[in-house]
């Protein structure tokens, strides 16, 4: 049974600007070290950062909490499986709230086009 859905769209140019400004504190606050390593190694790193940010926003919308109840940006991490499929790993408070809600699955889809990054999350009981 579907518990919640979340969609977010982000302008990739925002993250290009953050990268040009050398805004390391922002990246360190939002992304895990693994996400920073992954995105920084990519040719279009701003696109990858924007996608991961949109994924985290989408999860928070699907869960229905936003950044309340002690959830941190780093409690969510986007990883790719062996075939490149994106998955959302949950830690600490995000994982705790996920379990408390009786959820069993988190489906994530990412896409980008025309300067925008889009993420959709479906949470299932």
UniProtKB/Swiss-Prot annotation:
Q: Name one GO biological process term.
A: fatty acid biosynthetic process
Q: Reaction(s) catalyzed by this protein?
A: apo-[ACP] + CoA = holo-[ACP] + adenosine 3',5'-bisphosphate + H(+)
Is Magnesium there in the keyword field? yes
Where does it primarily localize?
A: cytoplasm
Entry binding sites for Mg(2+): 8, 57
Enzyme class, top EC level, equals: transferase
Its needed co-factors are: Mg(2+)
Instruction: Report the subcellular localization.
Output: Cytoplasm
Q: Name one GO molecular function term.
A: magnesium ion binding
Q: Name one GO cellular component term.
A: cytoplasm
Function comment: Transfers the 4'-phosphopantetheine moiety from coenzyme A to a Ser of acyl-carrier-protein.
Say which family it is in: Belongs to the P-Pant transferase superfamily. AcpS family.
Q: What's this protein's name? A: Holo-[acyl-carrier-protein] synthase
Name its species: Citrifermentans bemidjiense (strain ATCC BAA-1014 / DSM 16622 / JCM 12645 / Bem)
């Amino acid at each position: 049974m579907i518990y919640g859905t979340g969609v977010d769209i982000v302008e990739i140019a925002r993250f290009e600007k953050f990268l040009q400004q050398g805004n390391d504190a922002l990246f360190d606050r939002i992304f895990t070290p693994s996400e920073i390593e992954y995105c920084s190694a990519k040719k279009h790193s701003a696109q990858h950062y924007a996608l991961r940010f949109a994924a985290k926003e989408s999860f928070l919308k699907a869960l229905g909490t936003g950044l309340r109840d002690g959830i941190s940006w780093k409690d969510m991490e986007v990883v790719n499986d062996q075939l490149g499929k994106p998955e959302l790993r949950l830690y600490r408070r995000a994982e705790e709230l996920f379990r408390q809600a009786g959820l069993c699955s988190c489906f994530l889809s990412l896409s980008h086009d025309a300067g925008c990054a889009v993420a959709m999350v479906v949470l299932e009981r």
